[in-house]
């Protein structure tokens, strides 16, 4: 039972540590239409982005050098 709980926790943590930016790849980086919503996320450059779309813009602009760290402010 502990093994199952540990695997579930690992799976959940893995899923939360990724942002799917594939939907934004069809736009030029300078023209990605991000919604006006304030749901902050922290990037691996330790900058707080206003939402996942704005982080994806930077991820694509940096060719993947910046990554998602966690939800909320850095």
Swiss-Prot record:
Residues 1-17 form the signal peptide. Keywords: Disulfide bond, Protease inhibitor, Secreted, Serine protease inhibitor, Signal. Its main location: secreted. SMART domains: KAZAL. The record marks 36-37 as: Reactive bond. One of its GO terms (cellular component) is extracellular space. It is found in: Secreted. GO terms for molecular function: serine-type endopeptidase inhibitor activity. It comes from the Eukaryota. Disulfide bonds join 21-56, 34-53, 42-74. GO terms for biological process: inflammatory response; negative regulation of cytokine production involved in inflammatory response. Residues 18-74 form the Kazal-like domain. InterPro entries: Kazal-type_SerProtInhib, Kazal_dom, Kazal_dom_sf. The keyword Amino-acid biosynthesis does not apply. Probable serine protease inhibitor. This is Serine protease inhibitor Kazal-type 7. It comes from Rattus norvegicus.
